[in-house]
Amino acid sequence: MNCDSKGGLAQTMTNRSAFTRRKFMTISTAGFAVSMAKGSKIASQERDDPPLIIDCHAHIYGEDETRYPTIAKPYRPPNGKGTIQHLQQEMQSAGVRYVTAIQTSSYYRWDNRFTADSARANPGFMVGVCTLDPDDPRSPDQLEDYVQEYHIRGMRSIPAKSGRLDDPGVDKLWTTAERLGIVINALVDRDKRAELEGLARRHPKLRVVIDHCLNLKAGPAMEPTLSDMVALAKLPNLYAKLTFIPTGSAEPFPCRDLHDACRTIIQAFGPDRCVWGSDFPCELWCPKVTYRQHLGIFTHELGLDQGTMKAILGTTAHRLWFTRSA
C-alpha cells in the first residue's frame, strides 16, 4: 500500500532539506553527554542541543548470571553484545540520548530484577519497562513497587494462560498501570486486534503502545496486518512502535519492501503517536542491519520531514516514558 496517494503527510515526507545527511552524521560522530549521577532527573532539552533521539526498544543482558540467573534455555546474544556498556557505545555512536529498556523475557522471563536495577542505577539515560505474569495475583502489587521504587515507566503486556489479552488478570494489570500513569506496551499479533481494541476502549486514559505494529512483516499477511493497524489508529490512546522494518523485511538494508507500510502507519497514527526503537542488540534481533543503519532508515531512507522525524525519534517517546503523568 502506497501512502503517496493519500496526500498530506506523504507529501511533506519528501522534503529532507531541513534535516540533512551532513547534520545527522555530525551529530552521530560527535556523540552526546549524559548524566550518570544516581537520582538525577531527565531535564528539558535546550533549543541549541542536538535533536532529541530516544531508543524505545532495547533488550539488555546482564553479565553476572549468579546475581541475575537466566531461564533454563535463554536466547543469547553473541558474545559481548547486549550489555549496558555495548548499548551505551551504540547510543553514543548514533547520537541517541535516552533509551527504554524492555524486559528481556527470552532471557529472564518474569524476573525483572536486572531491568529494574539497571534502570534505577542509570536514571540519566534509561527507563525500564517490566513484564509481569497476568496469571499471578501478586503482579499488580509488584508493578506498583517497580514504579514507585525503581525507574520503571511501563509494562509490557501479553495474553494470559487462557490465551486471551482481555483476560481478567491482564485487565487488573492495565487498571493498575492506568492509575499509576505509566505506559502499556502490547505485544500481540493481529489475531488479538479485537481484544486489544476492547481493552483500550475500557481504559481510555491509559496510553498503549503496539509493539512492532502487530509484528508486521513482508508477505501474505502484510496487507491485512496493515489494515488492522490503520483501524486501531482510530483509538486516540493507541500508539505505534515502528520497530518492524528490519525484523519484518525480506530484503537487505535499507529494507525498502516495508517503507510504504511504515509511511502508511505514520499517516494513520500521526507522528505524535509513533515512536522508533532499535531492537537492540541488533546482532541478535535484526542482524541484517546495524544500530546506526536502523536509525538511518528513519533519518535518511523514508523521506520524513524534520517535524515528523522530531516527533517519531524523540518528542513522542519523551512524553510517553520520560515525563510522569501521575
How would you describe each model-predicted region?
Residues 153, 164-275, 284, 325:
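Catalytic pocket-lining loop regions of alpha/beta-barrel enzymes
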Residues 47, 122, 148, 202-204, ...:
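Short, structurally constrained coil/turn elements
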Residues 58, 104, 213, 279-280:
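Active-site metal-binding loops of divalent metal-dependent hydrolases
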Residues 102-121, 208-209, 257-264, 288-297, ...:
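A short, hydrophobic/aromatic-rich structural module that often spans a beta strand
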Residues 100-103, 131, 241-244, 275-277, ...:
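Short beta-strand segments
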